[in-house]
């Protein structure tokens, strides 16, 4: 179950990640943090794991633009992107067990 935003990531880094997502993908996407930042076991330079659900599979161009934007950003850590529509059910279950909503659309009380 998705939890309220309680992740091991400073607010300015959250805003930066959201701004990058919004600049390259439709506003209606759902994005979740998972991994060590969602479980609050991150170390200083732990990567940021993001699962993205655009309602469809992301294009290679979208993934490339996002990867480049995150790489060129001021975030002090690597961002690993996972396309929700490009993973198997086992991987989805693993992510669902610890995910924390990053976007409003990903919150459990959001419409859709």
Please describe what each predicted stretch is.
Residues 1-30, 38-44, 54-112:
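Catalytic core of pol beta-like nucleotidyltransferases
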């Amino acid at each position: 179950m998705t939890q309220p935003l309680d992740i091991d990531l400073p607010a300015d880094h959250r805003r930066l990640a959201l701004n990058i997502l919004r600049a390259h993908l439709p506003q209606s996407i759902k994005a979740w943090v998972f991994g060590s930042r969602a479980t609050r076991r991150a170390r200083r330079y732990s990567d940021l794991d993001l699962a993205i659900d655009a309602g469809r599979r992301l294009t290679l161009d979208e993934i490339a633009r996002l990867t480049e934007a995150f790489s060129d950003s001021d975030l002090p850590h690597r961002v690993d992107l996972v396309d929700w529509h490009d993973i198997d059910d086992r991987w989805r279950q693993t992510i669902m067990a610890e995910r924390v909503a990053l976007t409003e659309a990903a919150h459990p009380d959001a419409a859709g």
